[in-house]
Swiss-Prot record:
Subcellular location: Nucleus
Organism, as annotated: Schizosaccharomyces pombe (strain 972 / ATCC 24843) (Fission yeast)
Record-linked InterPro entries: Red-like (IPR039896), RED_N (IPR012916)
Region feature Disordered, mapped onto this chain: 1-28, 46-85, 366-386
Name of this chain's protein: Meiotic chromosome segregation protein C1539.02
Superkingdom of source: Eukaryota
Predominant localisation class: nucleus
GO cellular component, as recorded: nucleus
The entry's keywords: Cell cycle, Meiosis, Nucleus
C-alpha cells in the first residue's frame, strides 16, 4: 500500500457510516423479555466525528499541495487573503523574494499600507512626519536654552580632550588618568589635577576651573642606603621626633648623667645580722657590751693578735667590727651539731623490746651471739632416750 492509497482511504468515510447503520439496526431489532426496550439514539461516537473532520481537512490540504507542485511554485501553503491590505502585503513579500525590492523599501511600504502619512495618526500607527517636526523643534529649543558660559565650557573640554590625545601619541608622556581612584572635579566638570609620566617620572599638574595649570609637582625618587647603621639611626630618630613634629618643635636627645654612687656605703647597716638560731638572746651580757663597744670604734688595750693586724694594716677600714662574736657563734653551732649526732647514734642503739622494756644494742647483741646452752643439749638427749 502506498501513501496515495492510504490518503484515498482517509478521504472516503462511507464504509464507516454503513457499518454504523448496520450496527444500530441490529441493536434495535433485539428484544428483551419482560420489559420494554428503550429506543436507541442513532448517533455516532465522538471519536468517529473527529476522524471525519480530520479526513476532510487532510483531503483539502492534499489537493492544495498537489496543485502547487503542478504549477511549479513553492510548496508552502498560504491562506486566502481576507482584505486588500493583506493582498498587498502578500505581493510585497513575493517581490522581496524575487529580488525586485530591497528590505528598506519593503519596510517603508508595509508601514504605508495602514493609510496615507497625513492620516495614519488617526487610523493606525504614528505620523512620522509630525514626529520629525517635533524632534527638530526640540533640538532648536535645546540650542537656544544653552547659555554662552556652558558653550565655552564644552569648547574647553573639547580642547582638553584634543591635548590628551596628542600627549598619548608620544611614548614619553603617558597619561595616568585611568587609576582606581576617581579624580575630583569642579562644579563645571573640569578635573582638579592631571597626572602624566615624563621621562619615567610621575608629574602632577594642578588645574583651575578653566583648565589652566597652576602648579607642576614632580615626585622625587628616594635613594636607598646600604649602611645598616644609618637605617637604624633613622628609625630611632623617627620614633623620637613623632611628638616633636606634632608640636612643631625640634627635639634634641640629651645624655643624662647618672648620680654618683658611694661604694663604701653599707646598705645593710640598719638591718642587723642574720641570726637563724636566735643565739644572740643566750649570749652573755658581757659579749654584747663588747660588740657594742667595738661598733663605736673603740678598741680594748689587750686586743688579740688579729685585731692588731687590722689596726696596723692599710685596709683597716675594711676590718670586721664583730669578728669575735662571729667566731663564738660558729663554735656554738659546731657544738650543737656534734650533740645532735651523738643523740642520733644513741637512738640507733636503743631497741624497743615491748612491754615497756628498752634494751641497748649491746644487750641484744649478747642474746644473738650466744649459742645453744648445755641445758638445751641435756633436754634433747632425754627426749631421744624416752
Amino acid at each position: 500500500m502506498n501513501q496515495d492509497d492510504f490518503r484515498k482511504l482517509l478521504a472516503t468515510p462511507k464504509a464507516e457510516t454503513s457499518q454504523l447503520k448496520n450496527f444500530s439496526s441490529n441493536k434495535s431489532q433485539r428484544l428483551v423479555f419482560g420489559r420494554k426496550h428503550k429506543t436507541a439514539k442513532l448517533e455516532a461516537p465522538r471519536a468517529l466525528i473527529k476522524r471525519k473532520q480530520l479526513s476532510h481537512s487532510t483531503s483539502s490540504d492534499i489537493t492544495r499541495h498537489s496543485n502547487a507542485k503542478n504549477s511549479g511554485k513553492d510548496t508552502q501553503f498560504y491562506e486566502e487573503p481576507s482584505s486588500k491590505q493583506d493582498i498587498e502585503l502578500h505581493k510585497l513579500h513575493e517581490k522581496l523574494r524575487n529580488g525586485q525590492i530591497t528590505t528598506k523599501e519593503y519596510s517603508e511600504k508595509s508601514k504605508e499600507l495602514g493609510g496615507d502619512l497625513n492620516t495614519t495618526h488617526l487610523v493606525r500607527g504614528l505620523d512620522r512626519k509630525l514626529l520629525e517636526k517635533v524632534r527638530s523643534n526640540e533640538l532648536a529649543l535645546d540650542d537656544s536654552l544653552l547659555s554662552s558660559s556652558e558653550k565655552e565650557v564644552d569648547e574647553e573640554a573639547d580642547k582638553l580632550l584634543e591635548k590628551v590625545a596628542e600627549e598619548s601619541s608620544h611614548p614619553e608622556s603617558v597619561s595616568i588618568l585611568e587609576e582606581k581612584k576617581k579624580i575630583p572635579l569642579y562644579p563645571n566638570g573640569q578635573p582638579k589635577y592631571r597626572k602624566i609620566l615624563e621621562n619615567g617620572k610621575k608629574v602632577k599638574y594642578l588645574l583651575d576651573e578653566n583648565g589652566e595649570i597652576l602648579k607642576r609637582l614632580v615626585k622625587k625618587e628616594k635613594k636607598l642606603k646600604n649602611d645598616n647603621e644609618r637605617l637604624e639611626n633613622e628609625h630611632r630618630t623617627e620614633k623620637l621626633n613623632v611628638n616633636a613634629n606634632s608640636l612643631g618643635k625640634s627635639f634634641v636627645k640629651h645624655d643624662i648623667p647618672l648620680p654618683p654612687v658611694d661604694l663604701k656605703l653599707d646598705i645593710f647597716e640598719e638591718v642587723g645580722e642574720y641570726d637563724p638560731f636566735h643565739e644572740n638572746d643566750k649570749e652573755p651580757a658581757e659579749l654584747k657590751a663588747k660588740d657594742a663597744f667595738q661598733l663605736k670604734g673603740h678598741h680594748e688595750l689587750d686586743a688579740p693578735y688579729h685585731k692588731k693586724v687590722f689596726d696596723t694594716n692599710q685596709y683597716s677600714d675594711l676590718k670586721p667590727t664583730n669578728f669575735m662574736s662571729q667566731i663564738h657563734r660558729l663554735a656554738k653551732v659546731q657544738e650543737r651539731k656534734e650533740e645532735e649526732e651523738r643523740k642520733k647514734g644513741k637512738d640507733g642503739q636503743i631497741v624497743d623490746a615491748g612491754f615497756g622494756l628498752v634494751l641497748s644494742k649491746d644487750d641484744t647483741a649478747d642474746i644473738h651471739e650466744l649459742g645453744e646452752s648445755d641445758d638445751d643439749d641435756n633436754v634433747k638427749r632425754r627426749k631421744t632416750k624416752g
